[in-house]
């Protein structure tokens, strides 16, 4: 016999009290912690419990009785449906306050180590149109809003280009205007969409993988260059001819595009790292500039998506490193070598290590472009590359700069850092929780001397944090 489904309760007139680490807000009812999206502290709401565990629950606000005094009006028409920019309902001054609190809470509760006063967060000067890269998805299954569903009509146009709906991978929200990237991105996306509608191009079915148009990536840069990459599935010659007609339309309509590229992806997944990139018009790259340095950005290159704030982040890291020109610096998780090349003129030598071979090739090219002679770059898994033998061969670092992925550093990597005993460690993190865990391990030999949070992603809960550690006496 089937188990009887438990009715989940409706809680009335609950006050939202705080913001959680993952961007949802918090309410407490009889010692039960409830996580709620799209509300802010001070809202009084009715909550429909959606999922209940022993110590916490997840809920949806189904009715507002009072709006918080700090609530802001969302500026995006897609707010609440699109999975991005969930903090639009918080004024930016409140967003950075909670991000500062997130850093403090993680370092104190997880790290449990002695800390100096944490510096005020560096907010982003741009809070809209701050990203230099967006990826759009095509789909023949457009997400219908609640209002559209309630109209109970059959929609002729179900193709869409936009963003995936959270927890519904095969559905895409049709985006009319996104506030994350320069408006040229909106104009290109909408023009491609309209051209595809008018000429009956097929959009991919994300379940069956049938259809031509798959993805489009737009990259902008502070130099004014513009890259567009169109990704499609092509199995017949006539499809290729049709696709090139679209590419020519894009080139003619947007002469400001300096790099128009395309990729044929006939696989069942969206990864493009193993696929050939073809140039339809212009160059196969664009450039970013920072303090006179030029960084080559290709279609597959990683580059921090908020260029202006990345510069501020790197300046903090360089300042914390305290370089005099005589130091050997290790840059761990160097990516395309941006930090390594950025600090190179202040160091004797910089050694960068990164898992992705293509990123290391970009790092070498960027060093060559800028005439930098004192960098060495190595590709390989960090825990396999950074060993005592490596240090014995290339020298004991005076300073280590580490910028690991969200998972933080492997225990073996921490152990080798402790063995190397650099005078200073600059730890750049996109996840203060795993950073706090690693700081606790480094506490065996190091003392935290400075902490500087940096907001790279306004209207999201994400926060970067830079920590300076010095070797204890």
Residue spans for each PLM region:
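Internal alpha/beta scaffold segment
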Residues: 170-206, 210-212, 234-261
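Short, aliphatic-rich beta-strand segments
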Residues: 218, 224-233, 294-298
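Short, acidic/hydrophobic/Gly-rich beta-strand patch recurrent on exposed beta strands
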Residues: 25-30, 162-165, 231, 363
